[in-house]
């Protein structure tokens, strides 16, 4: 599934033979230090001539790939542009790592991480490795003939000023990459493979990292009173599950945790309110929010994060059947609040309602964040490059926004006003599960807010970014694994001690 990229660290003085040599230049095309020494005069002259003929200006995210000249111990020279001095000062190291891995392809390469004015830290180098690992990902185990080999199997030797420091920092980055890759794998799996019981089994594998796992089956959910979640699952031949993951990494195990909640609808046909056939195959990705939670717990446990975090996901399949829940049904949620079903395709909020209520009642978290591919309306509003953020807490909202900006997973805060809450009032129950056509993402968030008590809470609607998102230098996958890097950054900056 993953590309299996190998990354090693060597001092800048290291020299080798064969493979590619990767060097970096600004818009002045200047080579200096170790890069100039490795290329020598023949290599430097070739770069100048080729740049002129190919109109290579050294702009950021541009590259020149050349056969190595005689006298240079390499097969190819890969010259990567960094742009102007201003561009270099704001280098996105994760994207640079992905771009570099893309240019190297499935080859071996010595990458000289040094250039004029270079001031990269071990953390920057670690981010570079994260990007390279994410770029090398592929999901092709169901292909029996042509595999996706073009960027897989690369071996990068990074020549850096502090190999031991970079290697230590890169271990954490590797843990995050594992979490993103796990999330991508889960989203990409077909629903006949990743049905609820199998999903719960895969979550249970996190015990090998020290994560405590509890799986709630149908009997336990009925005992608790999770009527909203169970209603969604009625039409499926596959029983639902709730998977709860606890990572206790803080020095004080009794410290209240951060809670992460995910929607895990492994396939959403729409139920009785069935979706149109066109694009229904994408609904295997309607569990992208839950995948982000599972991937984050993996990353935190793998890097031994000094924080207490609980993750909980509701895993169901929404299918039409003689036993399916129907429009006009009234179901009772775990909170005791009743819900009139208007549209069975607005099922994710019912799943989240019971899980949110259970988590805050059981674990008394210091904050709750839920992630869900919840509404098409958020795609209309924000497209496929940014997630919608709804929150009852300005401080938490600001922290999430900053973490997303730093991690390259951007969010945009959306309004939560009384009018949206009023739109879900029902004539027959405490609320209805849709608020009509207008403001669909906001009325869905208002629905969830009714299941949040006095705790800082944020809802991330990731329908646009969680699946079939815009390709980038670090993602060529249909399932992006969106949210893992944001949440890991959030925990690192605000919840670790």
Curated annotation (Swiss-Prot):
Subcellular location: Cytoplasm
Residues annotated as transmembrane: none
Tagged with keyword Zinc: no
Catalysed reactions, as listed in the record: Release of an N-terminal amino acid, Xaa-|-Yaa-, in which Xaa is preferably Leu, but may be other amino acids including Pro although not Arg or Lys, and Yaa may be Pro. Amino acid amides and methyl esters are also readily hydrolyzed, but rates on arylamides are exceedingly low; Release of an N-terminal amino acid, preferentially leucine, but not glutamic or aspartic acids
Function, in words: Presumably involved in the processing and regular turnover of intracellular proteins. Catalyzes the removal of unsubstituted N-terminal amino acids from various peptides.
UniProt cofactor(s): Mn(2+)
Enzyme class: hydrolase
Residues that hold Mn(2+) 1 according to the record: 268, 345, 347
The name this protein goes by in its record: Probable cytosol aminopeptidase
InterPro entries: Leucine_aapep/pepB, Macro_dom-like, Peptidase_M17_C, Peptidase_M17_leu_NH2_pept, Peptidase_M17_N
Keyword Membrane attributed: no
Gene name in the database record: pepA
Organism: Methylorubrum populi (strain ATCC BAA-705 / NCIMB 13946 / BJ001)
Enzyme Commission number: 3.4.11.1, 3.4.11.10
SUPFAM superfamilies according to UniProt: Macro domain-like, Zn-dependent exopeptidases
Binding site residues for Mn(2+) 2: 263, 268, 286, 347
Keywords linked to the UniProt accession: Aminopeptidase, Cytoplasm, Hydrolase, Manganese, Metal-binding, Protease
A GO cellular-component term linked to this record: cytoplasm
GO molecular function, one term: metalloaminopeptidase activity
